[in-house]
Amino acid sequence: MEVIDLFKKLLSFPSITPDDAGSLEFIREYLSDFHALWFNKHGVKNLFLYKKFGEGEHLCFAGHVDVVPPGDGWESDPFEPLEKDGFIYARGAQDMKSGVAAFVQAVKEAKVFHGTLSLLLTSDEEGEAKWGTKYALEELERMHMTPQYAIVAEPTCEERFGDAIKIGRRGSINGVIEKIGKQGHAAYPEKAVNPIHKVAQVLPKMAGVDLDSGDEYFAPSKFVITDIRAGMEVTNVTPGRLKMMFNVRNNTKTTMQDVERFVHRYFDGMNYTLKLSQSAKPFLTDPNSKVVQVIDQAIKKMTGITPKHSTAGGTSDARFFAEYGVKTIEFGVKNDTIHAPNERTSKEEVEKLYLVFKEVIRSF
């Protein structure tokens, strides 16, 4: 089977998160000479395949087989791959069965490697992601099988194939501020404490503010207000409470404690509560590390392009590898149609991605 045939086969599985729809068992059979470990929990399947070629380092390719629901607006069946004008249309074409097909085919054809090659695949990245890669890595750590390096084949390229890799990701801090006032009649504002009026005074000082200056790899951490709600949708009652929700995509310079101090600076003296949670921690892989250097060279060899090192975008499963000290990068096809109707990627990109991964294995 060639990489494009494998790609089409994977696209035909209707693997809407967290259902792998049989795709993981298919991959296990396709790589039958690799040892297989299953880490399944709460309806989520995780497959770890590994093969020890030598006594050297452990390189893991990682990704997810689950996809988001297709939604409306498709011009073809989202789970029947359509080949047209050099593109393949299907849900998951970019995010991220192209990446999975490329590294599965690359490791299948590997004859020589100085250490251990492995694959970690999950059926829950697009959903809650609690029992996916995160859980599988917990089990691998317990078994002393954590890799030294990881390549997550998420779609990273922007304008053309090979133009960007991710060497890190911002974290995500979520917050809810509740300002407590005193409900009253709109005609007697002096007898009430209107939380909207109180909060309105500080909003210009908080909304969209940079919490740090960023650096050469990360944009500044920005305080982004996502929702404000208060009152009963009437015109003659001032509310007794106001709730404001926000998000900070933080770099390595800003912590949850920094966000707490920032909020307190403006809400000090008000009657308020603050709830904070961190759904993802920021990480950065050293640009001089082996995995970054090897992927850079492989991309340059196969495309003639030197990729930029990016940390932009949302979160991914790469963050879970980083938490275990795994030197992790992300590289895949372009990402201009992810989660959209008529998602597509070009056959040429998939073939080039497969060749890049083959070169990584050869030269690592």
UniProtKB/Swiss-Prot annotation:
<dbReference type="InterPro" id="IPR002933">
    <property type="entry name" value="Peptidase_M20"/>
</dbReference>
<dbReference type="GO" id="GO:0006526">
    <property type="term" value="P:L-arginine biosynthetic process"/>
</dbReference>
<dbReference type="GO" id="GO:0009014">
    <property type="term" value="F:succinyl-diaminopimelate desuccinylase activity"/>
</dbReference>
<feature type="binding site">
    <location>
        <position position="154"/>
    </location>
    <ligand>
        <name>Zn(2+) 1</name>
    </ligand>
</feature>
<dbReference type="InterPro" id="IPR050072">
    <property type="entry name" value="Peptidase_M20A"/>
</dbReference>
<dbReference type="GO" id="GO:0008777">
    <property type="term" value="F:acetylornithine deacetylase activity"/>
</dbReference>
<feature type="binding site">
    <location>
        <position position="95"/>
    </location>
    <ligand>
        <name>Zn(2+) 2</name>
    </ligand>
</feature>
<feature type="active site">
    <location>
        <position position="66"/>
    </location>
</feature>
<keyword id="KW-0028">Amino-acid biosynthesis</keyword>
<keyword id="KW-0170">Cobalt</keyword>
<keyword id="KW-0457">Lysine biosynthesis</keyword>
<comment type="subunit">
    <text>Homodimer.</text>
</comment>
<feature type="binding site">
    <location>
        <position position="339"/>
    </location>
    <ligand>
        <name>Zn(2+) 2</name>
    </ligand>
</feature>
<keyword id="KW-0479">Metal-binding</keyword>
<dbReference type="GO" id="GO:0019877">
    <property type="term" value="P:diaminopimelate biosynthetic process"/>
</dbReference>
<comment type="function">
    <text>Catalyzes the hydrolysis of N-succinyl-L,L-diaminopimelic acid (SDAP), forming succinate and LL-2,6-diaminopimelate (DAP), an intermediate involved in the bacterial biosynthesis of lysine and meso-diaminopimelic acid, an essential component of bacterial cell walls.</text>
</comment>
<protein>
    <recommendedName>
        <fullName>Succinyl-diaminopimelate desuccinylase</fullName>
        <ecNumber>3.5.1.18</ecNumber>
    </recommendedName>
</protein>
<feature type="binding site">
    <location>
        <position position="64"/>
    </location>
    <ligand>
        <name>Zn(2+) 1</name>
    </ligand>
</feature>
<feature type="active site" description="Proton acceptor">
    <location>
        <position position="125"/>
    </location>
</feature>
<dbReference type="InterPro" id="IPR036264">
    <property type="entry name" value="Bact_exopeptidase_dim_dom"/>
</dbReference>
<dbReference type="GO" id="GO:0046872">
    <property type="term" value="F:metal ion binding"/>
</dbReference>
<dbReference type="InterPro" id="IPR011650">
    <property type="entry name" value="Peptidase_M20_dimer"/>
</dbReference>
<comment type="pathway">
    <text>Amino-acid biosynthesis; L-lysine biosynthesis via DAP pathway; LL-2,6-diaminopimelate from (S)-tetrahydrodipicolinate (succinylase route): step 3/3.</text>
</comment>
<comment type="similarity">
    <text>Belongs to the peptidase M20A family. DapE subfamily.</text>
</comment>
<dbReference type="InterPro" id="IPR001261">
    <property type="entry name" value="ArgE/DapE_CS"/>
</dbReference>
<dbReference type="GO" id="GO:0009089">
    <property type="term" value="P:lysine biosynthetic process via diaminopimelate"/>
</dbReference>
<dbReference type="Pfam" id="PF07687">
    <property type="entry name" value="M20_dimer"/>
</dbReference>
<dbReference type="Pfam" id="PF01546">
    <property type="entry name" value="Peptidase_M20"/>
</dbReference>
<feature type="binding site">
    <location>
        <position position="95"/>
    </location>
    <ligand>
        <name>Zn(2+) 1</name>
    </ligand>
</feature>
<dbReference type="InterPro" id="IPR005941">
    <property type="entry name" value="DapE_proteobac"/>
</dbReference>
<keyword id="KW-0220">Diaminopimelate biosynthesis</keyword>
<keyword id="KW-0378">Hydrolase</keyword>
<feature type="binding site">
    <location>
        <position position="126"/>
    </location>
    <ligand>
        <name>Zn(2+) 2</name>
    </ligand>
</feature>
<keyword id="KW-0862">Zinc</keyword>
